[in-house]
A protein has these predicted regions:
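Conserved catalytic core of sirtuin-type NAD+-dependent deacylases
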Residues: 1-264
Length: 264
């Protein structure tokens, strides 16, 4: 399998069924794997943050999500066509995340890492809830809502998304309406480009360094725990199979079955 930084692929639907309840024997087996692991990796996806009130990328598009297609906004073409709309959309998402709190799942991962310093966290999420729970994150595969750079010269930019005056309005229709059509700032380094979100959009290359760190960790781990990821978006969906190929145990924690489920 090629370890070079790949391109974020468009999602393709897969058939999923409700996962069966985990029996006590399986729970005991997972506990034993966790207790014995010295180099575990937690690979987290959007489901990890759903209990914090952050909608998953593919949640039913009701309310606000009916107004805009997330897939259509998450492209370079969308930013070039309407930079103010895309910029406002991502600032709104960052403000919503800022008003949310880590959930017990984030806390459990952070506590496990304190007990097992060799544990690495690799996430597909663009929020900062793992960090706010106290975990050290090895790689944000798809970037971060809280990092920005120039769309032309690539220079990093320090941009504060701000917070709603009332945190209860974060992620609301009113907060989005207040932010829509805010133009992105100009780059202070080159003076020509616009500042864009530090997110990996569909069709873009994943940042090489985070991908290389994640790939190396999965090749070297003795346990991979996959939490809340649909297994749809490549290349991140291939990482558990890297661990399997290297002889590691893989545990999947998901409310539905994925393409990985039949292999673990």
């Amino acid at each position: 399998m090629n370890a070079s930084a790949p391109v974020l692929a468009d999602p393709h639907p897969v058939l999923a069924a409700s996962a069966p309840d985990l029996d006590p024997g399986a729970l005991d087996a997972v506990r034993a794997l966790v207790a014995a692991a010295e180099r575990p990796v937690v690979l987290s996806g959007a489901g990890m943050s759903a209990e914090s009130g952050i909608p998953t990328f593919r949640d039913a598009q009701t309310g606000l999500w009916e107004r805009f297609s997330a897939e259509e906004l998450a492209t370079e073409e969308a930013f070039l066509a309407d930079p103010a709309l895309v910029w406002s959309w991502y600032r709104w998402r960052a403000r919503m995340v800022r008003a949310r709190r880590p959930n017990p799942g984030h806390d459990a991962v952070a506590a496990w890492q304190r007990r097992t310093p060799g544990l690495e966290v690799v996430t597909q999420n663009v929020d900062d809830l793992h960090e706010r729970a106290g975990a050290r994150v090895l790689a944000h595969l798809h970037g971060s809502l809280f990092e920005h750079r120039c769309a032309d010269c690539g220079a990093p930019a320090d941009v504060d998304p701000g917070a709603p005056a009332d945190e209860a309005t974060a992620g609301s229709e009113a907060d989005l309406e207040a932010m829509l059509r805010e133009a992105p700032p100009a780059c202070t380094v080159c003076g020509d480009g616009l500042i864009r979100p530090g997110i990996v959009w569909f069709g873009e290359m994943l940042p090489a360094e985070p991908w290389d760190r994640a790939f190396a960790a999965l090749e070297d781990c003795d346990l991979c725990v996959v939490v809340g990821t649909s297994g749809i978006v490549q290349p991140a969906a291939s990482l558990p199979f890297v661990a399997l190929g290297a002889g590691a145990a893989v545990v999947e924690i998901n409310p539905v079955e994925t393409e990985l489920s039949g292999a673990v």
